[in-house]
Amino acid sequence: MPGSPPPENAPAVLWTCFGASGWRMLLMKQRRNEMKVLDLDCFDRKLPLICDLDGTLIKSDSLHENLFDAFFHSPQQLLRTIPNWFKGRPALKEALAKVRSVEPQALPYREQMLDLIRRARSAGRETYLVTAADQSIADDIISHLGGFDGAKGSSGSLNLKSRRKLQWLQESFPEGFIYAGDSAADLPIWEAASGAVLVGDGVKFESKLREAGVEVRTLSPEKSHPVKDWLSELRIHQWSKNVLIFVPLFLGRIADDFHAVLKTTFGFLAFGLIVSATYIINDLADLEADRAHATKRFRAIAAGRISVMNGFLACLVMLATGIGTALLLDHQFALVASVYLALTLAYSFRLKRVALLDVTVIGALFTLRIVMGQVLNGLAFSPWLFSFSVMFFISLALAKRHVEAMRACSNRKDTIEGRGYLPGDWPLTLGHGLASASASIVIMLLFLALEPRVTHLYHNPAWLYVAPLGVSIWLQRIWLLSHRMELHDDPIVFALNDKTSWFIGALIASAFVMAM
């Protein structure tokens, strides 16, 4: 009522500002927030807290992680498990766990669930991990985390899931239990439990369980940004490097041909899908290492925001769409794109750890983008452009390696993680990088001086000499920043965010326009 005194628990200022109805709304919001903290004090402390693993204690699925880990790191041993695939899920889980056991310290745990378990333990409540994952995985996890009174997983012919899990729980805890789970398979268990904790996707069953008379508590869902996560996972920002596919259109003076531009645009999109698929493959293969990395652990798959299975399925769809579109556009284009895919995978799994060969491969990968633009439009192969591109991008790749070597040296590290270089190799990366940069400039100058087609294609070719001058200044700047350890990004990414680079690029573009 207006003018009525505030309740004892209502601050006078809030009561004045919001009134009785506003205060009730604030109280309801506060209670909802309190429920999000999740308090189990309403349940008898004699009731143990039973926690599921996949999707509940961790954000991912341990079976899928085990499968992909074995596929990328122990493929031969994975093939030996094929007979177990026909013996049921428990046999498959056991066989995979023997091939490559999941590293418990690398799993994406739900912090809210860990906090709930800690608070339950401090309140004197027993806690158990009961999962359909293999028993060895359950044992490893509770050994790593601590805070559990025991663990039970699948073994032999027993797949501890849904009603089989319920049967085991009722036999082991006849006086009742509180169950924390996340999926439809947990419904029979929740309905028979003394209390239900809904986690992740399990929150959608809240109303159904309340109608069934089950005492329900929910963990507040973490803020999700699926579109942002997928754009980040697909590295859409890296598609900027694929703009090189348009370079032959401008150098071949066919940028005003609508059909050529349209065809190249479709090629750009198809190739972008293939490139994004390779990033997903790389993330799936390096999952354990990424989770141990200071920044890579925040990637969508590593953090569990995108499941490994969804990542794999997206990869298959993008590869099929990208290669299929490439085949429709031009068979030679599809062939070059396939070579790029094979070379990228070889680089990701092995070649990036081989000193000097790694930067040569990077130079080749960038050059293949230009080759795609040539074959897609039936343009003649240019050894000048090919040679310049290889040397130019080898220099940029070495600039990145140089920064890594310099930083490792200044931090007095003995090795550079994931690379074939040592900190003391920085004079080598500096020398080779500057030599490659100089070679690219010399190639450009020789092309302008000796290639007859220059005078045929351009009315004022003298303006073109601005290009090697601008590229030379830009490369010198890149190497200066690299040696000072001020180059914090990939040189291409750096250029896209650098005003000086844009100015030099605009100057070179203007020179080409004047030359026409």
Swiss-Prot record:
GO terms for molecular function: transferase activity, transferring alkyl or aryl (other than methyl) groups. It is found in: Cell membrane. InterPro entries: HAD-like_sf (IPR036412), HAD_sf (IPR023214), Prenyltransferase (IPR039653), UbiA_prenyltransferase (IPR000537), UbiA_sf (IPR044878). It is a multi-pass membrane protein. It comes from the Bacteria. Keywords: Cell membrane, Membrane, Nodulation, Plasmid, Transmembrane, Transmembrane helix, Transport. SUPFAM superfamilies: HAD-like. GO terms for cellular component: plasma membrane. One of its GO terms (biological process) is glycolipid biosynthetic process. The chain crosses the membrane at residues 183-203, 261-281, 308-328, 329-349, 356-376, 379-399, 430-450, 461-481, 492-512. Its main location: membrane. Possible permease/transporter. This is Uncharacterized protein y4nM. It comes from Sinorhizobium fredii (strain NBRC 101917 / NGR234).
